[in-house]
From Swiss-Prot:
Heterododecamer (2C3:3R2) of six catalytic PyrB chains organized as two trimers (C3), and six regulatory PyrI chains organized as three dimers (R2). It catalyses: carbamoyl phosphate + L-aspartate = N-carbamoyl-L-aspartate + phosphate + H(+). It comes from Cellvibrio japonicus (strain Ueda107). InterPro entries: Asp/Orn_carbamoyltranf_P-bd, Asp/Orn_carbamoylTrfase, Asp/Orn_carbamoylTrfase_sf, Asp_carbamoyltransf, Asp_carbamoyltransf_Asp/Orn-bd. Belongs to the aspartate/ornithine carbamoyltransferase superfamily. ATCase family. It comes from the Bacteria. This is Aspartate carbamoyltransferase catalytic subunit. One of its GO terms (cellular component) is cytosol. Catalyzes the condensation of carbamoyl phosphate and aspartate to form carbamoyl aspartate and inorganic phosphate, the committed step in the de novo pyrimidine nucleotide biosynthesis pathway. Keywords: Pyrimidine biosynthesis, Transferase.
Length: 338
């Protein structure tokens, strides 16, 4: 894939060599993310951060990644502050706003909306999530995290055993991650959810046609006994008809330390795309896992900055120039100290 000037809209754009290229560049970004060095390689460049759906981590992570490369960020959040409320099309919005930016990150609640926006854009557009469809940068950072966690244990992604747990129907992160995992060899995927929240059939079929083993179950304990990764997801309350309907599923697939100790292998890595619902009745990861060294959710979030830095460097064609515009850091940073 030629990254220069490219839109990043779907995981299906990538081949395995493209993934390796992104991850190699992400590895090279670590000194900058940890404030050991600073670079001005994107000095003068502008990121248009356009989020028409609530976001904290993804929006701030994109902004931080661009800032760490020396660029500037302009934010647009919510429909109420945009001309879309006046009937303006996504194409027209893109045509105008792309004149104010060098690259745009966009999140929108409608599936396919970011691709529609990209058709009108004169600059690269990166999909920050389009409704229940895809979240390609989250899938990339998830896979990057899996690679780093398994590498520390002397493993690779091939022959991975992973359980995906929770709302697999509405969770765009698991949709995109499954598509990425399809590029690797001999992956075993266990899908753990109530049947009403099951992974879409077409994703399951694509994985099986690619030669991967897919198991579908609603039993949490038996699904996590022989896995490398437990990937939990939240109930996507905003995609249900009512809060009561969403609440009916809470607590059924909650992973806590007692269940982990009883059923998981000692090195099983725990992941979650965040935000997690930490309330006692919620469906996700209990707070008593916070001291478990295999809880990777915060390392996962940190990795998002590295992967997004890599994507910006690649689509703006500066991946090989980052060090040229670097210098040592002058200020104290707790991140660097750790």
């Amino acid at each position: 894939m030629n990254f220069t000037g490219a839109h990043i809209l779907s995981i299906q754009q990538f081949q395995r060599e493209d993934i390796n290229r992104i991850f190699d560049v992400a590895d090279a970004m670590e000194p900058y993310a940890l404030r050991r060095r600073v670079t001005r390689v994107l000095e003068g460049a502008i990121l248009g951060n356009m989020f028409f759906e609530p976001s904290t981590r993804t929006r701030v992570s994109f902004g931080a990644a661009f800032n760490l490369l020396g660029g500037n960020v302009r934010e647009t959040t919510g429909f109420e502050s945009s001309s879309l409320t006046k009937g303006e099309s996504l194409f027209d919005t893109a045509r105008v706003l792309s004149g104010y930016s060098d690259v745009i990150c966009m999140r929108h609640p409608a599936a396919g909306s970011v691709a529609e926006f990209a058709e009108g854009s004169r600059v690269p557009v990166i999909n920050g999530g389009d409704g229940p469809n895809e979240h390609p940068t989250q899938a990339l950072l998830d896979l990057y995290t899996i690679r780093k966690e398994l590498r520390s244990k002397g493993r690779g992604i091939d022959d991975l055993r992973i359980a995906m747990i929770g709302d697999l129907k509405h969770g765009r992160t698991v949709h995109s991650l499954c598509k990425l995992l399809g590029l690797f060899n001999n992956v075993s995927i266990t899908l753990v959810s109530p049947k009403e929240l099951a992974m879409p059939d077409y994703i399951v079929e694509d994985l099986r046609q690619a030669g991967h083993k897919v198991t579908i179950t609603d039993d949490l304990p038996t699904s996590i006994t022989h896995i490398d990764i437990a990937y939990s997801t939240r109930i996507q309350e905003e995609r249900f008809a009512s809060k009561e309907e969403a609440d009916s599923y809470r607590g059924r697939f909650r992973l806590n330390q007692a269940i982990y100790t009883q059923f998981c292998e000692p090195n099983t890595v725990i992941m979650h795309p965040l935000p997690r619902d930490s309330r006692a009745e919620a469906n996700e990861l209990d707070n008593d896992l916070n001291t478990n060294p295999n809880l990777a959710i915060f390392r996962q979030a940190d990795n998002g900055v590295l992967v997004r830095m890599a994507l910006f460097a690649l689509v703006l064609d500066v991946a090989d120039q980052v060090d040229k515009y670097a210098r040592e850091v002058r200020w104290f940073s707790s991140l660097r100290a750790n």
